[in-house]
Amino acid sequence: MSLSEKGRTYVLFAIVVLACAFGSLTQTVMNSMLGGVEADFGVNASVGQWLTTIYMLVLGITVPAVTFLSQRLSLRNVVFLALGLFLVGGIVDVLAPTFGVLVFGRVLQAVGAGITLPVLQSIAMTRFPKGQNGTAMGIAGIAMGFAPNIGPLIGGALVDSWGWRSFFWLFIAIVVLLILAAFLLIAREDAPMRDARFEGVSFLYSALGFGGLLLAFSNAASLGVQSPLVWVPAVVGIACLVFFVARQKRIEHPLISMRIFESSHFRISFIAQNCLFASFMGITLIVPLYVQGLCGGSAVEAGIAFIPATILAVVVNPLAGILSDKVGARPVVIVAAALLTVGAVSMAFMDENTPLWMTTLMQTVRGMGVSALIGPLNSWGMSGLPREIMMDASAFFAAVRQACASLGTAIMVLVITSLSATAQSGAMNMSFAYQAAFGISAVLAACVLIVVIAKVR
């Protein structure tokens, strides 16, 4: 690889890392901004929650189609498409006169984020030399680990100081800079398969499958598992995903090649990372609820709990990737999973008297484990795959990961809601509701530790 080719690869990678980071950030930033949005538009919490629900739904639906886009368009144009959707979505949201318009802007942003997630992982695994994949994936992990952690902090600070629209002004400015950088610095290239055909039936199954599950998990937190709005989309989602997988195995040109599961590395990484994200994404919502709802803190104080882990993630993510390239993935992911488990188990013992510094310390230990796991586990899992199905693996994994993150969050919120009602009757201490939710995260973290010790070689 010549110096100029290296430079183009690094520039492309940097732009997509930043784009993906902002896509991930916009998913969690709304957790701290919902109160302000609901007050401005006069909607209740159940309606306001659609700002986060619709984002997850559209993100999960979009991701599987990225394989087709990567075949039909050049990588440069795929990046422009994602950034363009970010920009238009941000403009719609900052000017939104009604709640419905605000939701539409979130839909556009979610489509952009759904495009960047698998593209980022594919670049890390296919555009870098074999000995640098772990490092590249570690840097990519900043977008998946650092950005969601900082979302509640940014959202809380902005909504307390300048209102929720200020975030979208900041978002627009950064996206404009990324578009200019992409236009000036990303090299033009031909699309790999100009005659690629879109497999519409497979996409329909995928959209109904992932969309149904995400909708079911989101509704479960507020409606309970007995509601038809939970079990009907869940049944439809599971059935459609079964049809989707069966069709991918049968047709000549699948939307997502199921050959990805022929790799034992990918199967193991797939299981471990889905447990990781179910544990990780739920906590980004539960910690703000705990600090504000149980301990009486402000939105800024809730965000403070994420600051050290967020700062350390910038160092830990690439460092873990570098170490995995040098000494192998196994020692790195075992230490990382141990940190994750220790932090998660410790958080299960927090109550209303736990000081903010202690909450921050435990969240920092847990966050370091997450940061050190994402990159090495990703690169190890994809290392045994043929180059031509890397995008398939990235897209399918990103979609399933989103569903698992939503499931973990829904279960934790459902536990808090159910046990809080019991606590209000005087039957138990309110802190037990949050301890039970943190306990679920701890169990998932322990599952990750068991899998990496037993299977990652």
How should each PLM-predicted stretch be described?
Residues 140-180, 198-234:
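Helix-loop-helix hairpin linking two adjacent transmembrane segments in secondary transporters
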Residues 59, 119-121, 125, 177-191, ...:
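Hydrophobic, membrane-facing alpha-helical anchors
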Residues 2-3, 7, 131, 179-207, ...:
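Flexible interhelical linker loops that connect adjacent transmembrane helices
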